[in-house]
Structures are given as structure tokens and as C-alpha cells.
């Protein structure tokens, strides 16, 4: 029995095992049939359930149909009105209780209702529709050039007249009758292929314009080979303005090395230069204007191209002496020698020195020498006396009578010459009265060792008499050089100066220049090298030669420095006095201009045939994509836009070019077809350098090749540093990339402001902006009233259009930026403002409805190519900006916008005189660099300062402290952006205007992040991420509410990683909280955010660019301050060989006696892989020259240490001042606040012909070309060597400013000479009087002695 009991369990176990194995086997064999059976059962159950549901629904519907119909009652109208009336009254009665809160019941009811609504929203998942910026294509006028070229057929003038007018730049300055008088002399010439137009040896007396066919201009080298420097196509011309000047001055010369021949059968228009002489005989004043234009062309076109861009200096000037024999001085000197032999008591050892004058406190000083037995009392003049009188006679910006007196002259040729030279013509009586009181004194000594003499001769013996005789003799020789036969023209207008060795007579860049005529000694002319601070000697001015006449004729700044390396005496004629002489005798310019031409080298004469000076109308294409690259262009004035056409036919803005930029140089040097189409944004003036001329220059001066290589390399490097790879370059201040705009406008010359409506305080806005711009450089504000005061009431008439354009171009030359204030209606002045503007500011009031104004509708209907920016003004105490999207959506022509918080005075209702009086006081104070107007000024001039905040979790709390330190250090922020936590902190900074509010809101969010309850409630099943993101979304949306990025005070951007397109995204529009949340979406913790625009998935921007300084740079920032708070990876890892065992790692980790190893786990490896691109980008940013990198010591804090907010914030605040102090000591802060254009148009300092572009400046630093040695230096080496040995003991850098010594100073004034009166810093920008025409004249500046440190 026991045995059976033992067997049964075993049998049962065996049976169970067999059944289970059989079941498994059956399931394996019939798995497919089992699945089909299950599906069938499920379908049957579903059909049964649907049938039952249909049955019950049918029963209910049938019962409803069988029920009796209920009668429908109709409300009477009176009952309906009473019903709704009672309902409204019930609402009204409960409203006061809700507002005042007399009882707790209404409040409790409101709270309950709010909770129910929020619960319903969560359950039903209602999504709020945020306003979005509508993507629009740019207007055709922005990216497309006019298809119509120079139209000859539709013009009422003959084609030959149009061709001549279009090509010969000087002819455009003639009035219509004068031009038609010249056209009478034109002759048609038919040429066969190979036939020469002119050859070497023939007289150079003609202007040729090709009507059809093609000419070749050749230059013969020293070895006899001919080089084609220019191909002349129909409509182009062959002429040299220097040759025209030779004909006018009566010094005709033959062609020496230049020839022209017909490449194909051609028809040429021939105009003899002698035709100009007949016109000048009838209209003498026109002579002055034409000579001035030729001189301007020489300085602005020829010297700009050859010196600034090709690095040539001594090669441009003729070192040989051009002096005339000083016969009169020699005869006087001979008599003086005979008189000196009579006795030593009549000898004067040297002229009075500055120390002798400084040692006296009286109005007279005894001038004595060791050999002088008798002393004479010499009255000292006031330093500022007569220069004040001269400036008062010339008129200031506020002198209306001076404007009225000069209205008639301002529109004449002589008046235009005065305007270019920045001299207001005054009447003969004014000049005579100002000089009448000066004729009584004999010898006047000034602190700069300058002697002035009266017209009446002195007969008394002694040193004064002999010096007076030398002065009169030198004046006679000067009359001979200037070809004047009336000595009275120089009476009271010439000063005789003696300067000691080492004196700098005039500095490079001086505006007020004198004509100097050397009598004894020698003046050395130096020019600063473009790649260093060293000077190179251009030529020597010997006795009998002039210097400084080119700057006087053109009104441009002086191109070189004039220095006396040994004692020197010379005559000086101020610019104002020379123009007075010229007003009486216009032909005086011929002799003076001829001295300039003689100083030019033969090389300049050759290149003058190849260089073209052209004017392009707005909308005209300079060249088109795919054209042959046969020349390069230099922008003299105006603005050009480069557009590239993609393969799909779409056009993209590649860049813009302003004054001084090189255009098309890359394609020309690489011999490639044009890569883009370039057209004129507004009427522009260009210099054209043909490729053949460049080839000839390279053969003659090989060092130019090195410079061209650097130009090409720096151009490519500059485009890379602009961040072209980001794909989000912008045009103004926002990376919305609505039109994918190109280079930011750091080189704007003109800005126009126009109102949306008449309610806009445009005058106050313009004055505020002018005040802010004055901190950057000289600025000029022009209004219609201002123009009528300056140029006369008829200045805006069409007949004076060219003269007005010329005058406005001169203002661009001498000012950093010109601000045009348009009228509120479409007047001729408003049209002129739009036509002249590089950028148009459309000014509106932020609290008004975003309706279109009258002027805006006109902008939309006309093809205005200048970029338009929307400026919204807000009151200080008013609400924050809102509804910006509506403003932008209604204005498709706006490429950007800015919000300005204006002081109360902007909106004050004051009359114009009171407004001017108020701003007169305001202009006495420096502008606030933290104001919104200063921010606008920096953005317009390309000096914006950007702040970029990196990602790093809780370590980003240190950025709050750094923001406080920035404000205390006085560093303004114009653009802000960031990644991850940096995007959050940057958004707070862009929205709030006070640090305390930023800290409060940031701390509130940090406390939410430390809430454990909210974190647990946000957990979800980790398929995509550990958290659902609901709680995180609510924490961010509670901070920013419904704020849009467009409504922020500062231009702002956030960086995200688009994992759909595998690219970086830059967000500058849309819901603020949404893109801040997207930028903080860490992989694995938060799900990607779906972009409502295109549905792309957005993740944390730190994976691709954790410190986006390059993006801020592409938005137009000059300097980027980058705050890095990212974690630093461990780099000291264990080298474990070729294989790694996880068991070995486990043993090392658990064994307390084993040596610890540093090996990454899988999560760390994945994290480092994700941040590989970010680390590379960070290294590029840290090594860039535009970025100032700052990293606080926050490595000890972890990513989620939000509970230590105060501690981390304090670390940032303590570290900020330490870093900023280093910036102050090293000069970084000063450089940060300076204008980016080093050669800006300063009235007091610095050279300005045309400022170079940024890449050219870099090339000038890199390229060091050894100058070719010239004969002038070799000739002087015999005596210069021993003289240079004595120079250290001499104040070599003494700079005597003689710019206003051409007028005798009144000896009766009681002002005493004082060193404190004289010096004015040459490096500090001075507010130009023209920049604020209504202010009183404060430009009082007399003779001074300048000693640089």
C-alpha cells in the first residue's frame, strides 16, 4: 500500500508534465490559428455590443416620436425686454460687491468660478491662440534692380549730349545753358579697327566718349611693352581731368605713355578741352567750381584707390623741386647782409620764443637778445580776439541774417565752392570793417612765434624793419606764383611765420588748413602708413614752393602732416582769406591748382586715364550675377545692395556696402564671374578701378600683390566671422530673418525719420536721437526749415536739385551720420529725405492703434529700396509694449522694430522755440548711455553691445548677479539672448527695466523648481521623457504670462535644437514662454516642444550652441559679452587599455582597498556625445576677437541646485566687478564704447576721405609693405643725417596750430595769452556747430600750441 502511495504522486506529476508539454507543443504548432481565433472572438463581441447599443437607441427614438407634441409658446417683446433688463440689473448689483469686497461671498464665488474654469481647461485641454508674425516675402524693390538701363531713346535730349553728360563727371556741375554751350563743340569721329584715337607725342587736349564700338586704352611701360588698362564700351569715356586742368591753366602737355585705339570699328564723340576756356570767359565763377571738382576727384578717387587700398604713398608724388626763384627775397637778403656788416648791435639772434612770452604777466613783453643793446615793448594780442570776429562775420548755425545774406550766393558756383570748403561768404564791407581796426599796429608777437604785419611799410632800421622787408619781398614772389598783378589782394590776408625746428605746422586730418609758401628753410611732408603709426616722407617743400593748397581747394581734410625739421619761415594764407581773394579774382585758382598738378607723379597721370568717377541712380544695377568681372568699385557716397539668386529662382540679400567699401574685388582678383547682382539703394557715387589698370600697377609695384592677397583673404575671413553659417543674419536688430537680411548696417551714413501720424512728436524724437548720436561722432540734423535757412527758400526747387544733392553729399563727408527729419506730409523735402536715406525710421506711438499712415502708404506704393525700421515710442509711466505683432503684420516693408521708453520731455506739448530752448540746455550735458535713444544710436552706427547668457541649470542663477554688476559698472546692453537657463534670464532682462524685479521673479521660479510635490505630480511613464512637462510649462508661463518676444524692450533671441530638421533654430518672435521652455527642454527629462509654426520638435539649445555669441554678432553687435555657466567635463580619465570589463569596474567600485578609477558610464558617454558640437562652438567663441568671455567660479554647484539661488547669485555678483576691473585697466571697456569706425568723420581729429571697411583695416594691419626709396630722401641725406642727431634735444613733436593766424589780432584787447586758453584735445570729438543749427555758436578756438604726450 505504501508503495502504491509512493507511485501515485509520481504518476500524477508525470501526467501533469505530459499535459503541459503537450499544451506548449500545441500552442507552438497552432499559434497562428489561435491568434486568428482570438481576433474573431473580439470582432463578434464588438458587433454584439454595437447591435445592443443600436437597439436601445432605436427604442428611445421611437418612444419620443410617439409622444404628443408640446405646444411652443412665444414671448412677447415687452416680456423679453423686461427679462433681459432684470438679468442685467442683477449683474450690476453684484458687481460693486465684487469690486469693493464688502462681503466675502462674491469673492468666494469668483474664486470658485475661476477654479472650475481652470479645471475645465485642464480636462478639455483648450489651447490659447497667440498672435503670430506672418511670414512675408520681401518687396520686389528690396532685392531687385531696375530692368531699364540708361534710356537714350525716350529722352528729349540728343544721344550724344546724354552720353557726354553721363560720363564726364565735371560736366554734371554745369548749368544747362553752359553745358549746351559746350555741346556745340562736339564732333563725331569714325574709327576703323586698329586705328589710334591718340598716341604718345600728340597734345593731350581732348575728351572722348564712345557712342558705339569699343576702345582700348594702353599704357607703355619702361621696357616699351603696352598694357591695356581699360576697355571703353559704348557710353564710357576716355579723358583725364588733370589734362583738362592743364589745358585750362595754359600748360598743355603731350601724351607721354598713354594711347588709345579702336578694338573694333567705332564711333566716338570728341570734345576739345579748349571749349572750356570760352565758357569760363563768359562765366568766371564756374571756373572755381570746375577746378574744385577736379581737385576733389584727385583726392577722393585717385588717392583713395591708390593709397588707402593699394598701399602706395611715395609713388604718388613727384619728389623733384617745383620751386620758383625767390628773386625779391634774394635781393632783400643781399641788402640785409650789407647792413649787418655795419655793427653787431643791429643783429637779432633769433625770433622771440614761447618761453619769453610765458615769463611775462604783463600786456607787453621786452624782447631782447644778447647782442641787442636796446629793448622794445611789443604788445601781446588776445588769443581768441579776431578769430571770434571772423566766425561771427562768417555766421554760425543760428545766425539767420548770415544765412539770408548768403542765400543768393549759396546757389551760385562760387557759393557751392564756399559750401564745400565750409566757408560762408560774407560781404566786402564786413571783411573791411573787421580789418580796419587792425591796420594801426606794426609788429605783433604771438605765442606760436607768428608775426603779423600791416599793409603800410616800416622804414625804421633794425630787425623788425628787415623782417618787414623780407615779408614784402616774399609777398611779391607769392604774387608771381599765384599769377596776380594786384598786390592789394594780399593786404591783410597774409601772415609771415617763423617756426623753430621740430614744429608740426599742420597735422594729418586737420580741417582748417592754410596755404603755406616757404620763404626760408624747408617743410617736410609726411604721411602716416596705413599699416602702422610710422610716418613716411613724401616730399620736401623748398623755398619758393606751396603746400596745403589741395586741402584748401577741396575743403577735404589734410592728407599729410607738415613738419619743420629745421627753423623755417613761410607765408600763410588762411582758407577764408584765400576764398576772399578767389571771390575777387576767380582765376587765382588756376595758378594754385597747377602747383598741385605739378606735384603729382607721372604714374598718377597715367592711372587718371584708367580710373572712372561715376554716379549711379537709385535702383540701377552696377553689375549682374554672371557678368564678366573686369573691375572693382569703391563706394564714395551712397549705398549699394548685393543680392544672390539661388538655383530655385529665389533671391537672398547677400550684403550691403556703404561709404569706403570695396565692391566686387573678390571676383576680379580670382577672375570669376560675378557671384551676385549689385544695385544702388540710393543715388550713389563710385570710383571704378579696371582690372587692366590693377595689372599694370602690379607689374610696376609688386608689393601691391601682397596687399591684394591680404585684401582677398580678409574679405573671406570677414564673411566667415559674420556668422554666415548660422543662416540667421539680420539687417537691423532682430534675427527674425523675415527676409534673411545680410550684413548689419554698421556703415550707415544717412538716416531718415518719418512719422506714422501727426500725433508723433517727431521733432523731439529727432533731437533726442541727435543728442544720443553726438556721443559717437559728429552728427547733423536737417529739417525743411533748416535747409531753407541755410540754402535759401528756393533750395528745394527742382532747378537746384543737383546743387542740393552736392551740398548734402558734403555734409555726409564731414559728419559721422546725417539725420533727416521728414515732414508729416508728402512734401518735396520728405521725398528728398526718403531719397537720401540709407535707412528709414518709421516712428509711431506704442499706445495708439496700429493703423497705416499717409506716408507709409506712399512707401508701400513706391519702390523705396532703403531698409525701413519701425520705432515705437512709449511713455515712462505707461504700460509695457503690446500688440507689436499687429504693427508688423500691417507693414510688410518693415525689416525690424525697436521699442523706446522716452522721457517725459519727448511728449511735452511745447512750442518749437521753447522746445529748442529746452534742448539747448540738454545738449550741454553728455547723453545717458543707458537710455533707449543711446541704444538706438549704437545700433544705427554698428556699435551695439550684446549680452549672451549660456546654459548650465542652477548655475545660471549667477547670471542674475552679473547683470547687477554690469549695471553698476555702467556697461549698456543693446541686444540679449541665450540658451537654456540663459534664455530664461535673458528674457527677464529684456522684459524688466529694474534689477530688483528680475531677481524677485527669478527667485520665484527657482523656488518652484525645488518643489518636490510639483515634481512628483509631473512624473509620467518614461517612454519619451520622465516628466510630462505640464508643471514645468506652468512654472514658466506663470512668470512670462502672455508676453510675446516682439513686445520685449530689448532685441532678444533664444536658441533651440530642431531635432526634426537637425539644425539650430534662432527664435526672435512668437510666445516668449514657449520658446524659453523649448530652449530648456533637456533630453530624457522633458519631452520636445512642438513648434506651433511648423510642427518641428524643439529641444535644449545647449546641444548645438550653448553660448551663442556668433548669433549675437550676426545681429549687428560690435562687442559680445558672453557669460558661460556650463559644466566642465572631467578630462583626467583612466587609461584602461583596449578592452574594459564591467566586472573589473564593479570590483574597483566595491572594494574599499582598491585604487579608484575614472571611467565614464553609458549615460555620461551619451551626454558627452550630445554636447560635442556645443564644445567646439564654445572654443570658437572664446577665441574670437569680438567676444569678451566671462565665467564665474560656479563649478562646485550642480545643475539642479536651485535651492541655493541666493548663494549662487552672490557668487556672480562678486565675480562681475573683478572681471570688469580688468577690462577697465586693459582698455577693453573704452574700446567697447568707442565708435567702430576708427577713421570716423571727426571735425577735430583723424583723417577722413572715405572710411575703410572692416576687412580693409585688418588687411592694413597684416600687410607690411616696405616703401620704395625716392630721390627726395636720398638728396637730403647729406644734411638730414647730422640734423637728425640734434633732434632729441629739440621739442620735435611741438604742434603749433596756425589755422587761424591769417588774420591780425587786435592789440587793444585786454585778453592775455594763456596756455589754459589754447589746448583743445585733438582726440576728443567736438560737437559740430552744424549738428545743431539752432544752438548758439560755441566753436571759439584760437591759436594754440599743441604738445602731444
Curated annotation (Swiss-Prot):
Region (Involved in the binding to lipid droplets): 678-964
PTM-bearing positions, type Phosphoserine: 341, 377, 1277
GO molecular function: lysophospholipase activity
EC number: 3.1.1.-, 3.1.1.5
Domain PNPLA: 947-1113
Cell inner membrane listed as a keyword: no
Binding residues annotated for a nucleoside 3',5'-cyclic phosphate 3, in chain numbering: 610-715
Residues where a nucleoside 3',5'-cyclic phosphate 2 binds: 496-599
One Gene Ontology biological process: phosphatidylcholine catabolic process
Cytoplasmic-side segments: 58-1349
Keywords noted in UniProt: Endoplasmic reticulum, Hydrolase, Lipid degradation, Lipid droplet, Lipid metabolism, Membrane, Phosphoprotein, Repeat, Transmembrane, Transmembrane helix
Keyword set includes Endoplasmic reticulum: yes
Full protein name: Patatin-like phospholipase domain-containing protein 7
Amino acid at each position: 500500500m505504501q508503495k502504491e502511495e509512493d507511485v501515485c504522486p509520481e504518476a500524477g506529476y508525470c501526467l501533469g508534465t505530459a499535459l503541459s508539454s503537450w499544451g506548449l507543443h500545441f500552442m507552438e504548432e497552432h499559434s497562428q490559428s489561435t491568434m486568428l481565433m482570438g481576433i474573431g472572438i473580439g470582432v463578434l463581441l464588438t458587433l454584439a455590443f454595437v447591435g445592443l447599443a443600436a437597439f436601445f437607441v432605436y427604442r428611445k427614438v421611437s418612444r419620443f416620436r410617439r409622444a404628443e407634441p408640446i405646444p411652443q409658446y412665444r414671448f412677447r417683446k415687452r416680456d423679453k425686454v423686461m427679462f433681459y433688463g432684470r438679468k442685467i440689473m442683477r449683474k450690476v448689483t453684484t458687481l460693486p460687491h465684487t469690486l469693493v469686497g464688502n462681503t466675502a461671498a462674491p469673492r468666494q464665488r469668483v474664486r470658485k468660478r475661476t477654479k472650475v474654469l481652470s479645471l475645465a481647461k485642464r480636462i478639455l485641454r483648450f489651447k490659447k491662440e497667440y498672435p503670430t508674425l506672418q511670414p512675408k516675402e520681401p518687396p520686389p524693390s528690396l532685392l531687385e534692380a531696375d530692368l531699364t538701363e540708361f534710356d537714350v531713346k525716350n529722352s528729349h535730349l540728343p544721344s550724344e549730349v546724354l552720353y557726354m553728360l553721363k560720363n564726364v563727371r565735371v560736366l554734371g556741375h554745369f548749368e544747362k545753358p553752359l553745358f549746351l554751350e559746350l555741346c556745340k563743340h562736339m564732333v563725331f569721329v569714325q574709327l576703323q579697327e586698329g586705328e589710334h584715337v591718340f598716341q604718345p607725342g600728340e597734345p593731350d587736349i581732348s575728351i572722348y566718349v564712345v557712342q558705339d564700338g569699343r576702345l582700348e586704352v594702353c599704357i607703355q611701360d619702361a621696357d616699351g611693352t603696352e598694357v591695356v588698362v581699360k576697355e571703353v564700351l559704348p557710353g564710357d569715356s576716355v579723358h583725364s581731368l588733370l589734362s583738362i586742368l592743364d589745358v585750362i591753366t595754359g600748360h598743355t602737355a603731350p601724351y607721354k605713355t598713354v594711347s588709345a585705339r579702336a578694338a573694333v570699328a567705332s564711333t566716338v564723340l570728341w570734345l576739345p578741352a579748349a571749349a572750356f576756356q570760352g565758357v569760363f570767359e563768359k562765366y568766371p565763377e564756374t571756373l572755381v567750381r570746375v577746378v574744385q571738382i577736379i581737385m576733389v576727384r584727385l583726392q577722393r578717387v585717385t588717392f583713395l584707390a591708390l593709397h588707402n587700398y593699394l598701399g602706395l604713398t611715395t609713388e604718388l608724388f613727384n619728389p623733384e623741386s617745383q620751386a620758383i626763384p625767390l628773386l625779391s627775397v634774394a635781393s632783400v637778403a643781399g641788402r640785409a647782409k650789407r647792413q649787418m656788416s655795419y655793427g653787431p648791435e643791429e643783429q637779432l639772434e633769433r625770433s622771440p620764443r614761447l618761453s619769453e612770452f610765458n615769463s611775462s604777466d604783463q600786456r607787453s613783453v621786452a624782447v631782447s637778445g644778447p647782442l641787442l643793446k636796446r629793448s622794445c615793448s611789443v604788445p601781446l594780442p588776445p588769443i581768441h580776439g579776431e578769430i571770434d570776429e571772423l566766425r561771427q562775420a562768417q555766421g554760425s548755425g543760428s545766425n539767420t541774417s548770415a544765412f539770408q545774406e548768403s542765400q543768393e550766393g549759396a546757389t551760385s558756383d562760387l557759393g557751392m565752392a564756399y559750401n564745400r570748403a565750409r566757408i560762408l561768404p560774407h560781404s566786402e564791407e564786413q571783411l573791411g570793417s573787421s580789418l580796419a581796426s587792425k591796420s594801426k599796429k606794426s609788429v605783433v608777437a604771438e605765442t606760436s612765434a607768428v608775426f603779423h604785419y600791416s599793409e603800410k611799410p616800416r622804414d625804421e632800421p633794425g630787425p623788425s624793419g628787415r623782417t618787414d622787408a623780407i615779408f614784402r619781398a616774399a609777398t611779391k614772389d607769392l604774387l608771381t606764383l599765384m599769377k596776380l598783378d594786384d598786390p592789394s589782394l594780399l593786404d591783410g590776408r597774409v601772415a609771415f611765420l617763423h617756426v623753430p625746428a621740430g614744429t608740426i605746422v599742420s597735422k594729418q586730418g586737420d580741417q582748417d588748413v592754410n596755404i603755406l609758401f616757404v620763404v626760408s628753410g624747408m617743410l617736410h611732408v609726411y604721411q602716416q602708413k596705413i599699416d602702422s603709426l610710422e610716418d613716411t616722407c613724401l616730399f620736401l617743400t623748398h623755398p619758393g614752393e606751396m603746400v596745403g593748397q589741395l586741402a584748401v581747394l577741396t575743403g577735404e581734410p589734410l592728407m599729410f602732416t607738415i613738419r619743420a625739421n629745421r627753423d623755417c619761415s613761410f607765408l600763410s594764407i588762411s582758407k577764408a582769406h584765400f576764398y576772399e581773394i578767389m571771390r575777387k579774382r576767380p582765376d587765382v585758382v588756376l595758378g594754385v591748382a597747377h602747383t598741385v598738378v605739378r606735384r603729382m607723379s607721372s604714374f598718377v597721370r597715367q592711372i587718371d586715364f584708367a580710373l572712372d568717377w561715376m554716379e549711379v541712380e537709385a535702383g540701377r544695377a552696377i553689375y549682374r550675377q554672371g557678368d564678366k568681372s573686369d573691375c572693382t568699385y569703391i563706394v564714395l557716397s551712397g549705398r549699394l545692395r548685393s543680392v544672390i539668386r539661388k538655383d530655385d529662382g529665389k533671391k537672398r540679400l547677400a550684403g550691403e556696402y556703404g561709404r569706403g567699401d570695396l565692391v566686387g574685388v573678390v571676383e576680379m582678383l580670382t577672375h570669376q564671374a560675378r557671384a551676385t547682382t549689385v544695385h544702388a539703394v540710393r543715388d550713389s557715387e563710385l570710383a571704378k578701378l579696371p582690372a587692366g589698370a590693377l595689372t599694370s600697377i602690379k607689374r610696376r609695384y609688386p608689393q601691391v600683390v601682397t596687399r591684394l592677397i591680404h585684401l582677398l583673404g580678409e574679405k573671406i575671413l570677414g564673411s566667415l566671422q559674420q556668422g554666415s553659417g548660422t543662416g540667421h543674419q539680420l539687417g537691423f536688430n532682430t534675427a527674425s530673418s523675415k527676409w534673411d537680411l545680410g550684413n548689419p548696417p554698421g556703415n550707415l551714413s544717412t538716416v531718415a525719420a518719418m512719422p506714422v501720424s501727426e500725433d508723433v512728436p517727431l521733432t523731439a524724437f529727432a533731437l533726442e536721437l541727435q543728442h544720443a548720436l553726438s556721443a559717437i561722432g559728429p552728427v547733423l540734423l536737417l529739417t525743411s526749415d533748416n535747409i531753407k535757412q541755410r540754402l535759401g527758400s528756393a533750395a528745394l526747387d527742382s532747378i537746384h536739385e543737383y546743387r542740393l544733392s552736392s551740398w548734402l553729399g558734403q555734409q555726409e563727408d564731414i559728419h559721422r551720420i546725417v539725420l533727416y527729419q521728414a515732414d508729416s506730409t508728402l512734401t518735396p523735402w520728405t521725398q528728398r529725405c526718403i531719397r537720401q536715406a540709407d535707412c528709414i525710421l518709421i516712428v509711431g506711438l506704442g499706445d495708439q492703434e496700429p493703423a497705416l499712415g499717409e506716408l507709409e502708404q506712399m512707401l508701400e506704393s513706391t519702390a523705396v529700396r532703403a531698409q525701413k525700421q519701425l520705432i515705437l515710442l512709449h511713455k515712462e509711466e505707461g504700460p509695457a509694449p503690446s500688440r507689436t505683432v499687429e504693427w508688423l503684420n500691417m507693414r510688410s516693408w518693415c525689416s525690424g522694430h525697436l521699442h523706446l521708453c522716452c522721457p517725459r520731455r519727448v511728449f511735452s506739448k511745447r512750442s518749437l522755440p521753447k522746445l529748442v530752448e529746452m534742448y539747448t540746455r540738454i545738449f550741454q550735458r553728455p547723453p545717458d548711455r543707458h537710455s533707449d535713444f543711446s541704444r538706438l544710436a549704437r545700433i544705427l552706427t554698428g556699435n551695439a553691445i550684446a549680452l549672451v547668457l549660456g546654459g548650465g541649470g542652477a548655475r545660471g542663477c549667477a547670471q542674475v548677479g552679473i547683470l547687477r554688476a554690469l549695471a553698476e559698472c555702467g556697461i549698456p546692453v543693446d541686444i540679449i539672448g541665450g540658451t537654456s537657463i540663459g534664455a530664461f534670464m535673458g528674457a527677464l532682462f529684456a522684459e524688466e527695466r529694474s534689477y530688483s524685479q528680475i531677481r524677485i521673479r527669478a527667485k520665484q521660479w527657482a523656488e518652484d523648481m525645488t518643489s518636490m510635490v510639483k515634481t512628483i505630480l509631473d512624473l509620467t511613464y518614461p517612454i519619451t521623457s520622465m516628466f510630462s512637462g505640464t508643471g514645468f510649462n506652468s512654472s514658466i508661463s506663470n512668470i512670462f504670462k502672455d508676453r510675446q518676444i516682439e513686445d520685449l524692450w530689448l532685441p532678444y533671441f533664444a536658441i533651440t535644437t530642431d531635432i526634426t530638421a537637425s539644425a539650430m533654430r534662432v527664435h526672435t518672435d512668437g510666445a516668449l514662454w514657449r520658446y524659453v521652455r523649448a530652449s530648456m527642454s533637456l533630453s530624457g527629462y522633458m519631452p520636445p516642444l512642438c513648434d506651433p509654426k511648423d510642427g518641428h520638435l524643439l529641444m535644449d539649445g545647449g546641444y548645438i550652441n550653448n553660448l551663442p555669441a556668433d548669433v549675437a554678432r550676426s545681429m549687428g553687435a560690435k562687442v559680445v559679452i558672453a557669460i558661460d555657466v556650463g559644466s566642465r567635463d572631467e578630462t583626467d580619465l583612466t587609461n584602461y587599455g583596449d578592452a574594459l570589463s564591467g566586472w573589473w569596474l564593479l570590483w574597483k567600485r566595491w572594494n574599499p582597498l582598491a585604487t579608484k578609477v575614472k571611467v565614464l558610464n553609458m549615460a555620461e558617454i551619451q551626454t558627452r556625445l550630445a554636447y560635442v558640437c556645443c564644445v567646439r562652438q564654445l572654443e570658437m567663441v572664446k577665441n574670437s576677437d569680438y567676444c569678451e568671455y566671462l565665467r564665474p567660479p560656479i563649478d562646485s554647484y550642480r545643475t539642479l541646485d536651485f535651492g541655493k539661488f541666493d548663494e549662487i547669485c552672490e557668487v556672480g555678483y562678486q565675480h562681475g566687478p573683478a572681471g570688469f576691473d580688468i577690462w577697465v585697466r586693459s582698455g577693453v571697456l573704452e574700446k567697447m564704447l568707442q565708435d567702430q569706425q576708427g577713421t570716423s568723420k571727426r571735425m577735430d581729429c583723424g583723417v577722413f576721405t572715405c572710411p575703410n571697411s572692416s576687412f580693409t583695416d585688418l588687411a592694413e594691419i597684416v600687410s607690411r609693405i616696405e616703401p620704395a626709396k625716392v630721390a627726395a630722401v636720398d638728396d637730403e641725406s647729406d644734411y638730414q643725417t647730422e640734423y637728425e642727431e640734434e633732434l632729441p634735444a629739440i621739442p620735435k613733436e611741438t604742434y603749433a596750430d596756425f589755422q587761424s593766424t591769417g588774420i591780425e589780432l587786435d592789440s587793444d584787447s585786454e585778453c592775455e595769452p594763456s596756455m589754459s586758453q589754447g589746448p583743445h584735445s585733438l582726440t576728443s570729438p567736438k560737437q559740430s556747430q552744424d549738428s545743431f543749427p539752432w544752438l548758439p555758436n560755441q566753436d571759439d578756438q584760437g591759436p594754440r600750441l599743441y604738445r602731444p604726450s
